[in-house]
Amino acid sequence: MPWAVGRRWAWITLFLTIVAVLIQAVWLWLGTQSFVFQREEIAQLARQYAGLDHELAFSRLIVELRRLHPGHVLPDEELQWVFVNAGGWMGAMCLLHASLSEYVLLFGTALGSHGHSGRYWAEISDTIISGTFHQWREGTTKSEVYYPGETVVHGPGEATAVEWGPNTWMVEYGRGVIPSTLAFALSDTIFSTQDFLTLFYTLRAYARGLRLELTTYLFGQDP
């Protein structure tokens, strides 16, 4: 009936309006945030260690980040490599810093993997330490290959196909609505692998990052 169709369109219009307002509110909120890290800062630090053994590179990077940003990088006893299954690919990550609007982590795969990048309310950049990163951008018919020392930027709302060769490791920085990225990052873990221990490890790492940021905000950091 005509009135039913009209009512349906009214609900659709209301839903789209709410989504638009929510998106605008989110970006206004991000515009008011003061960020701890900068994308180019992380990329430049990572480039210094590109080509080294990835474990050596990561250990040196962590030391430097703690020197530059005391109180914002998790202590050694809380660093943990955790599997990530998302978008059909499998890798591992070690979270160094996390807040509601930023994160810094180490990421990679020992075996190689490929799949969907995901779409995020965040900008994500990866600077490669070792291996290769293949990216096929939406709307194109050719892929691009990135090598150690190069940075791959994934903009908000973008989607790509990604492939990492064996022993590919990188430093990743994300800025945006970070909790929104967890839905994609945990989807395969919940609905496919059902590896709930990994789910616990991931949520615990993020909670530790939030706790550290709250502690530093409330009590400061000893020089």
From Swiss-Prot:
Residues 31-223 are cytoplasmic. One of its GO terms (biological process) is regulation of neuron apoptotic process. One of its GO terms (molecular function) is signaling receptor activity. Residues 99-106 are annotated as: Important for ligand-binding. It is a single-pass membrane protein. Homotrimer. Interacts with KCNA2; cocaine consumption leads to increased interaction. Forms a ternary complex with ANK2 and ITPR3. The complex is disrupted by agonists. Interacts with KCNA4. Interacts with RNF112 in an oxidative stress-regulated manner. This is Sigma non-opioid intracellular receptor 1. It comes from Rattus norvegicus. The gene is Sigmar1.
